[in-house]
């Protein structure tokens, strides 16, 4: 059984509230879970201490027993000092796409042609 530490949504419409739960990876997002490990209230201010509440002792226990946190939960665990989140580095993502590079090359070519025409006219 693959275990995940993930968020289960609660609250009402447009007023989200999430429980940090340990669940089987195959169960639905808000479905059956094994243990409630904390909560996250995104409606509170970012510096509010009650915004993210975690049971660090139980989370460490489950991480040691093979549970995998989701990306968002891993961010919370990294902030709390419970688990280490590796920074992702994707230098290719910052590069413009193929079409954008073609448009930039065309624009540079037109500017060079215009400069050459202006020099020839003088």
UniProtKB/Swiss-Prot annotation:
InterPro entries: Ribosomal_bS16 (IPR000307), Ribosomal_bS16_dom_sf (IPR023803)
Keywords: Ribonucleoprotein, Ribosomal protein
Region described as Disordered: 85-122
Any GO BP: translation
UniProt key word Ribonucleoprotein: yes
Record family assignment: Belongs to the bacterial ribosomal protein bS16 family.
NCBIfam families (UniProt xref): S16
This protein's name: Small ribosomal subunit protein bS16
């Amino acid at each position: 059984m693959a275990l995940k530490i993930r968020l289960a949504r609660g609250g009402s419409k447009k007023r989200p509230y999430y429980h940090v739960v340990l669940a089987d990876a195959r169960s639905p997002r808000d479905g059956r879970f094994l243990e409630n490990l904390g909560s996250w209230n995104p409606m509170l201010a970012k510096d509010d201490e009650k915004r993210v509440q975690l049971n660090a002792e139980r989370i460490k226990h489950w991480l040691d027993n093979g549970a995998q946190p989701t990306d968002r939960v891993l961010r919370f665990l990294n902030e709390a000092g419970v688990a280490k989140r590796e920074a992702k580095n994707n230098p290719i993502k910052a590069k413009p796409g193929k079409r954008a590079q073609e448009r930039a090359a065309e624009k540079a070519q037109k500017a060079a042609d215009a400069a050459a025409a202006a020099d020839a006219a003088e």
